[in-house]
Structures are given as structure tokens and as C-alpha cells.
Amino acid sequence: MEKHDIKYFENKKQCQFQEWYEKFKSVTFSSIVIPLPKIFIDYLQSDQFTTPHEGFPEFKVDEHDDLFDDNNWSTSKNHISTLDPKYYQGYSDEEDESSDDDDSNDNDKDKKPKRIVNETEFKELSNQIIKSIEKLGGNIFPKLNWSSPKDASWMNVYNSLKCTNTTDIYLLLKSSDFINHDLMQFSINQDDKDDSLTPYVLVLRKWQNLQPSMEFRCFVKDNQLLGISQRDISTYFKFLKDKKQKIQDAIVKFYNESICGKFSNNSFTFDCYVTKDEQVWLIDFNPIHPSTEALLFVWDELIPELIEQDQDEKENEETKQAKEELPIEPLTKLEFRIIDDESGIKPNLAMTSRLPLDLLQSSGGTGQGNINDILLNFKNQNLN
């Protein structure tokens, strides 16, 4: 591992939820951290998913949290209230696994445990999760050390991260590419006992009815708040223009009073949520690194000297385009960016997890581009 990779991983470890939660407990949502045994990690990394039929509710009605019911700030959503069986499938070794992408998945399969783990084998953990859900009011959303399975939310009966039982949680965790990435951060000794604890934790956070329009990412360099970006850059929220200054003032006050000088690093990013009465809540911390989305900024203007990349590393297309259009000047004072009109909307990269693998590969791995070009490319590949 190279020197800058080691530095990044050390910074990333400081952003693990269990590393900062106790210090910032008063300004974030109530949560319970559960250490995970090796057998559960094996379960998440295996391709097997089975659950008793009674684990799936036949009907659910979404309930809003009174404290964070900010629906009047955004367009109402259509909530899924009935179970669609096609989203819940059991897989076994007897199924036909032949497909065009077999070769591309061979290496991934080799890394995964070959054993099949049944949920009854970690019943004690499941009981602990059930009790924790009850303590948090019956509705939670899950995450691991760093990531939440937001890319798999469409698999959930609520079409969100809201979970009410272990089946909801296990389905989201096993369906998420983000969670799979978390599981590659630490090496687990396969010779360890099943009940031995791993570096991984399951975080259960009290469910809040948050509106994506009021989530923001903040960028800090040497304890100076340099940038604030709209978190959901795939949507234009017209009302944000009128609220922009009040939102900025609220975030700056929150940072100065609750975050500045208290995190374990001087340069980092943090996500926060602003309620309709300008109360700010901390959501998460992330390290300064190209793997952390800069959203409406580019890293060269935020913290260029801290972004260590190999010369041969492929540049992000947006970064290359920005460099060609005009020189990038590093920011010296706070800048708050939102999408000012519909022309500023950017692709939601998390949505690529919902695309068919063949289509994703045909679009260069991003799912972006002119759909006619993608389909033509896909057709030509099949003809060859």
C-alpha cells in the first residue's frame, strides 16, 4: 500500500460511525451500534438469501415522523404499500447461473465465502437487532461503518431505507453495492470462529422522514468551512433560491458551535440536514478524497494539495471538462452552491445500481450518455 493510500485509509477510519457518534451524539439522530460477528459478514458476502415467508409483511403504510415531517418543502412521493414478490427472490446453488457476465464475476465469486449461512445461525444477533429496533421506536434505517445501502432502497417495500424488521435490513444490506464496498475495507481471517467479532458494525439509526432537498454536504479545510453543496444534484428545487441565505447562516452557525475543532481531523466533509425552521442535524462524516463526491464542486478548487492521485489515474470527465473551459482557482472563502435551474441537473450515480449490467457496461460503466448511442453500441456488441 502506497503512502498516500495509507494516509487516506487512516482518515477514512476516523470517519467510521462508531468513531464519532459518542462525541456528536447531541447533534445527530439517535442510533445504536452493534458489533458484527464473522458469521454475519460471511452471510452478507455470500450470494445466498433466504428468509421465512412470514418475515415479509403483506401490507405496510408509511408513517411520518412528526419532528422531521418536511413534506411541505418538497414534492410528495408515491409510497409503495404492497409487497411485490418479484423484488424478493431466493437463490441457491441449484439455479442456472449461466449468463453473459459469468467471466466478469469469476473473481468476485472467488473472494466470497463458499459456505451457505442461514439466518438461524446468528439468531442471537437477530434478537439483538429486534430489541434495538424497538428501543428506537420501531422504525430505523441501517448502515455499516461508513455506508448506508441507499443504492438498494428500491428493493425495499417502502422504496426507502426505512426498516421495521430484520428481513428489511438483511435484504437492503445484501442488495447494496455500497455495503459490498464497505466489506472490502478490512480483511477477515476465515479461520476465525463464527462468533468472533470483526471490525465491522451494524448501525441502526432512528428513522426520520427527511426530504432530500434539505440535505447538504459541507467541505472543511484546516478547520475552515470552504464549501456547501446541495446533496441531491439530480433534482432542481426551485424554493432553495429564496431560502439559500437562511440555510447558509444556519449551517455556518452549526459548524462553528458543534463541529469546528471537535472532529479528529482538520480537513473533512460532513453531511447535514436542515429542517424547515433552520435547525441543523449532523448526518455523517466523510474523508477528503476523490472517492468522496464533490457534488457541485471539483476537488481542484476545494483542497487541491490534499488530493494525491497517480498521474496515470483516469480523470473524472467533469473535472477534465472544467479544466478545458477555464482555469480552476482554489476557493479562499465560503461558497454555497445549489442548482439554479433545470439545466444544472447532474446524473444521480447511485441510480446506476438499478440498471441492467449489460446496459451499464455498454455505457462505459456510468449509465450516462445518449440512450440511442448506448443502445446502438449494445446492438453492435451483440452482432460481433
UniProtKB/Swiss-Prot annotation:
Organism: Dictyostelium discoideum
Protein's name according to its UniProt entry: Translation initiation factor eIF2 assembly protein
Family matches, as Pfam families: D123
Gene: cdc123
Binding site for Mg(2+): D284, N286
Location of the region described as Disordered in the Swiss-Prot/TrEMBL record: 90-115
Membrane-crossing segments per the record: none
InterPro entries in alphabetical order: CDC123 (IPR009772)
Keywords assigned by UniProt, alphabetized: ATP-binding, Chaperone, Cytoplasm, Magnesium, Metal-binding, Nucleotide-binding
Principal place of residence: cytoplasm
Subcellular location(s) of the protein: Cytoplasm
A GO cellular-component term linked to this record: cytoplasm
Binding, ATP: K143, W146, S148, K150, R205, K206, W207, E215, R217, R231, D271, D284, N286
